[in-house]
Swiss-Prot record:
Keywords: Chaperone, Cytoplasm, Stress response. This is Protein GrpE. Pfam families: GrpE. It comes from Sorangium cellulosum (strain So ce56). NCBIfam families: PRK14140.1. Its main location: cytoplasm. It comes from the Bacteria. GO terms for biological process: protein folding. Residues 17-26 have a biased composition (Basic and acidic residues). Residues 1-14 have a biased composition (Polar residues). One of its GO terms (molecular function) is protein-folding chaperone binding. Homodimer. InterPro entries: GrpE, GrpE_coiled_coil, GrpE_head. It is found in: Cytoplasm.
């Protein structure tokens, strides 16, 4: 064998020995690591459990905070509405008090009209609108028919009277209008043939 072949063989043997040593070391690590791996897995499980508990606590706190914020917003909304309505109520009380001592009903009626206008203006500022009913086609999404009557003046399906007004808050129905709807002209029976 030549020197160069022997060198090549030694190099291969050296590389093989290194690779063999690395494999042996890796095998030794694998052989001794089940306990280590178990410890690492337990530590990782403990970290994950702790993270889960923190996340659950954060979510619970978020839910409680959100509930408090919603309740507070509702309270502020009711408070704002009451602040707008209390002056109307005050004027109603004044009108009732004045009605007891008023010599004529005309002044009481005028006071009630003024308070009614104030109330309608307050509702308007809040975005609450009265639903148009009389003379309009019956709309089941905003009208509640409580009666149908024959009418020669109105075609079938038209609202002819409002029993109770309905109201909308923007696009949201607060209360449907209770209405009487026309059935159209009454159909007269055909004369009997003799």
């Amino acid at each position: 064998m030549s020197d160069s072949e022997q060198n090549g063989s030694n190099q291969n043997t050296g590389e093989t020995a290194e690779a063999h040593a690395e494999r042996a070391e890796a095998a030794e690590q694998q052989a001794s690591t089940p306990e280590d791996k178990l410890g690492e897995a337990q530590a990782e499980a403990a970290r994950m459990r702790e993270q889960l508990l923190r996340t659950a606590a954060d979510f619970d706190n978020f839910r409680k905070r959100s509930r408090r914020e919603v309740e507070e917003a509702q309270r502020r909304g009711r408070e704002a509405i009451l602040k707008d309505l209390l002056p109307v109520f005050d004027n109603l009380e004044r009108a009732a008090s004045h009605a007891e001592s008023a010599p004529d009903a005309k002044s009481v009626a005028e006071g009630v009209r003024i308070v009614t206008k104030q109330f309608v203006d307050t509702l308007d500022r809040m975005g609450i609108k009265r639903i148009a009913a009389v003379g309009k086609p019956f709309d089941p999404s905003v009208h509640e028919a409580i009666q149908q009557l024959d009418s020669t003046e109105h075609p079938a399906g038209v609202v002819i009277a409002e029993v109770q007004p309905g109201y909308m808050l923007g696009d949201y129905l607060i209360r449907a209008a209770m209405v009487v709807v026309s059935k159209g002209s009454p159909v007269e029976p055909a004369p009997a043939a003799n």
